């Protein structure tokens, strides 16, 4: 039960926080399209509204009016299981304590069964790892602990990735795991002299849409607590090492191009990936085109560095979700033609350099190459702005086994033949790291097999551990 989602938390006395949260979640819709939800605290109780669907489908003006209050958390969800069950949507609520609490989570825990067993809980009855965390917190709170103490106790035992927002009576807490696998940032509503409220969100564009000022990223292991009086910070968990391990795929694919991560704008980083990828190649072609959306900045960079003209060869249907984060493989492959349509006049007879962000399973890329050939492309040369995806991610990306990963089971020549392209090349790991320009501050386990946090890994049917 793995999720890579978007989370929001807002405290703004006197403001319509439900509508603010709606706009922030809309800015994070790319991080998950299966379900959306909000929880607010008003009149001494927490109200939760959540359902399957996009943010615009789940919430209406009437719904948002019912969520009036000064404290809110929100969530957009992408998962690998339970997608048809709206009860698996977040935030998760528990009635423990005086007012109860609600929780929303981006990431994936790797020791859920151990946590459940130690607490005498059947994990199979839990809807997700987020549901399990909420249950463990409720056990502590019902035993007399404050929510802050319960968070320290429970999260110190959790392994894996979590960027989490928690709504309590008149408080919003935001916590990041000790490695900083998933992004989380803090923003201010109003000015420094006239603060109107505070916002935490997975990505900075969720702050921009509210007119909030970016303050900083929440540090690994840090807990930020927001009340009507302001913001306080504590080091809830000990950071794991002197450098955080933000997922490298946030730069490659997940994050919006206008997001800032670790001080770097994602769009600029993706253009640099394309430039360095072009420097690896000596290719004669007529047109460089990117696969929308993540591949376009890299294609622009490739064209700049190679001298081959940049152009558009694919039109994207904006009403179709992202194929990588569709919940199952059949839908991913089928959605390619619904999502993308070739510009035949730009493609016909042309030798194309097609830049995409990644190849994970290969099914969508295979369909894409076939579509371009049907449109009359003379050659289709694939250039990928990330190295081969070789290892499963246990920290929140939908790749549970190596059997699903094309590069883990085939050579590049075999991949090229399977996909049907004329040539295939990936950016080197060294060039990807150079493009991001961060010294050891990213998790690249999916590319190297070097997992920074302990996690069970199935290799040839044998469960081992990688540290």
Predicted segments, located by residue:
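Conserved short alpha-helical segments that host acidic/polar catalytic motifs at enzyme active sites
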Residues: 1-220, 225-285, 291, 379
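Flexible loop/turn segments at secondary-structure boundaries
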Residues: 17, 80-81, 111, 173, ...
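PRPP-dependent phosphoribosyltransferase catalytic core
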Residues: 155, 170-171, 196, 211-217, ...
């Amino acid at each position: 039960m793995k999720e890579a989602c978007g989370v929001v938390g807002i405290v703004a006395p006197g403001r319509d926080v439900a509508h603010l949260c709606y706009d922030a979640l809309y800015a994070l819709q790319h991080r998950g399209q299966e379900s959306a939800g909000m929880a607010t605290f008003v009149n001494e109780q927490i109200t939760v509204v959540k359902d399957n669907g996009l943010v615009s489908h789940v919430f209406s003006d009437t719904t948002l009016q019912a969520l009036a209050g000064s404290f809110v958390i929100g969530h957009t969800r992408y998962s690998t299981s339970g997608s048809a069950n709206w009860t698996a949507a977040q935030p998760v609520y528990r009635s423990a304590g005086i007012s109860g609490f609600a929780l929303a989570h981006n990431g994936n825990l790797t020791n859920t069964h151990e946590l459940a067993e130690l607490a005498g809980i059947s994990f199979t009855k839990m809807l997700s790892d987020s549901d399990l965390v909420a249950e463990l917190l409720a056990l502590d709170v019902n035993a007399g602990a404050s929510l802050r103490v319960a968070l320290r106790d429970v999260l110190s035992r959790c392994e894996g990735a979590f960027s989490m927002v928690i709504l309590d009576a008149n408080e919003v807490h935001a916590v990041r795991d000790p490695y900083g696998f998933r992004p989380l940032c803090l923003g201010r509503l109003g000015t420094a002299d006239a603060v109107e409220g505070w916002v935490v969100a997975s990505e900075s564009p969720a702050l921009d849409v509210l007119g909030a000022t970016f303050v900083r990223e929440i540090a690994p292991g840090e807990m930020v607590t927001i009340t009507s009086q302001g913001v306080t910070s504590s080091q809830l968990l000990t950071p794991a090492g002197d450098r955080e391990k933000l997922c490298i795929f946030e730069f490659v694919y997940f994050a919006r191009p206008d997001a800032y991560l670790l001080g770097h704008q994602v769009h600029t980083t993706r253009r640099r990936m394309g430039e360095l990828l072009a420097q690896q190649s000596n290719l004669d072609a007529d047109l460089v085109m990117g696969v929308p959306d993540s591949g376009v900045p890299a294609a622009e960079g490739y064209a700049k560095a190679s001298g081959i003209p940049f152009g558009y060869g694919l039109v994207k249907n904006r009403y179709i979700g992202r194929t990588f984060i569709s919940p199952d493989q059949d839908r991913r492959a089928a959605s390619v033609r619904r999502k993308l349509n070739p510009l035949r006049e730009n493609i016909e007879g042309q030798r194309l350099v097609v830049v995409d962000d990644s190849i994970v399973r290969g099914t969508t890329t295979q369909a894409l190459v076939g579509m371009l050939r049907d449109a009359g492309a003379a050659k289709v040369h694939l250039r990928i702005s990330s190295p081969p995806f070789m290892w499963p991610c246990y920290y929140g990306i939908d790749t549970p086994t190596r059997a699903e990963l094309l590069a883990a089971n085939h050579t590049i020549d075999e991949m090229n033949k399977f996909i049907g392209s004329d040539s295939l090349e990936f950016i080197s790991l060294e060039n990807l790291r150079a493009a991001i320009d961060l010294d050891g501050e990213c998790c690249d386990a999916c590319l190297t097999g070097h997992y920074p946090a302990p996690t069970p890994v199935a290799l040839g049917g044998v469960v081992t551990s990688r540290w």
